[in-house]
């Protein structure tokens, strides 16, 4: 009788032990499922940025904005390779001499019929280049997300867009307009530091951060009509700002779950 009771006790004890062990294993597996390896992802980006000019660029323009598209490949080791194209737009001018010789004291332009014209001056341009960088995940729950450092290099161009809606001023037509638009271009390098987030459900994928762009540019017009001279000086065009990107990811395959 004593042995039977002892056997029954040991049986119950072993049963509870097995159940507890199974529960522990299930908990470990459930936990491991949450830990994912990094994926290879193709990214199609919609990019928006606000930039503040510095150095030579600040003498010509005020705050500007960028909107563009990009494509990037994120490897399983979280390295990034890509390319982008961005439009530049702005409406604040600081080039005081522009149209000075055909303006009234009130800042308007008079056409041949003696009518006052409010000629619009805007910043227009674009940036295109190649990108390389890396994501540094620090939360094991999502190996695709984390702080990001991205370098870019390529070509930039901008000019002053002179808008004469009625096309009624001869000095602002065709070849004459080129003497005022300050067409400028050259090479640039850009650094971006921010945070990249890829959602587990793949629906919300964004990045945001700060960018610093340095352009090695030069005016490309042979003659500036408002200054009555040429301008061959090398320029340092700097843009410092904030960038936000919306990412449409295409995964090579479904995210793998790693069991330990």
Where do the PLM segments sit?
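Internal, conserved structured core segments that host functional sites
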Residues: 82, 122-161
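Cleavable N-terminal export/targeting peptides
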Residues: 1-37, 251-260
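Residues that define the transmembrane beta-barrel architecture of outer-membrane proteins
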Residues: 40, 63-67, 122-128, 145, ...
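Residues on the lipid-exposed face of transmembrane beta-strands in outer-membrane beta-barrel proteins
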Residues: 46, 50, 69-73, 85, ...
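Extracellular/periplasm-exposed beta-strand and loop segments of Gram-negative cell-envelope proteins
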Residues: 33-35, 55-60, 91-125, 158-186, ...
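Short loop/turn motifs that connect adjacent beta-strands in outer-membrane beta-barrel proteins
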Residues: 31-41, 77-78, 138-146, 198-206, ...
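Short glycine/proline- and aromatic-enriched beta-strand/turn motifs that initiate or cap beta-hairpins
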Residues: 21-76, 80, 84, 245, ...
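Predominantly the C-terminal beta-signal and adjacent terminal strand-loop region
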Residues: 191, 197-260
């Amino acid at each position: 009788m004593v042995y039977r009771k002892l056997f029954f006790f040991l049986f119950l004890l072993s049963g509870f032990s097995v159940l507890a062990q199974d529960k522990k294993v299930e908990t470990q597996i459930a936990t491991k499922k949450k830990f994912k390896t990094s994926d290879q992802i193709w990214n199609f980006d919609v990019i928006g940025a606000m930039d503040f000019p510095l150095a030579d660029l600040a003498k010509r323009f005020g705050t500007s904005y960028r909107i563009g598209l990009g494509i990037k490949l994120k490897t399983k080791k979280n390295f990034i390779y890509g390319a982008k194209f961005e439009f530049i737009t702005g409406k604040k001018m600081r080039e005081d001499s522009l149209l000075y010789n055909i303006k009234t004291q009130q800042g308007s332009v008079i056409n041949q019929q003696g009518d006052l014209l409010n000629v619009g001056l805007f910043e227009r341009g674009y940036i295109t280049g190649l990108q390389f960088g890396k994501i540094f995940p620090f939360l094991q729950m999502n190996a695709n997300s984390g702080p990001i450092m991205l370098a870019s290099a390529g070509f930039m161009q901008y000019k002053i867009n002179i808008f004469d809606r009625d096309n009624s001023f001869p000095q602002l037509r065709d070849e004459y307009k080129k003497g005022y638009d300050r067409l400028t271009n050259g090479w640039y390098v850009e650094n971006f530091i921010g945070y990249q987030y890829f959602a587990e459900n793949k629906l919300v994928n964004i990045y945001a951060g700060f960018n610093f762009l340095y352009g090695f540019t030069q005016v490309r017009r042979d003659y500036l009509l408002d200054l009555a001279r040429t301008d061959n000086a090398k320029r340092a065009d700097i843009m410092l700002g904030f960038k936000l990107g919306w990412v449409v990811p295409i995964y090579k395959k479904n995210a793998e779950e790693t069991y330990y």
